[in-house]
């Protein structure tokens, strides 16, 4: 049996706390929560994080040996979210983000880092209200020539 994919989670707001709860409760098989980072360790998030390692700075997740993939749910176009994603991709760690603003501002920059390191940048949740349109375009419609996608 292969070991679980070890997640480093940055941001424990509404979405981040739900992700943590889902992983810790086993709803997502084959995944474990190795480390988390948030501004306030003492805030009640409605999920028991006592068994999870806390790091002081988001970039610590990118450097952690017990983290395979980063889930960035901090938000915003600047640091600490931007620095975390840059550091994680440069270190060869794949990143999952729902950060529309950061992707709009830095997508090309992040694509260059991702390509150079071989790490993936997954952002499906940031597009089309979370509808799996990116996967559909890449996989199910790969044989078609799509010239434009429009949305509101």
Regions inferred by a protein language model and the residue ranges of each:
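Conserved anion/nucleotide-ligand pocket segment
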Residues: 136-152
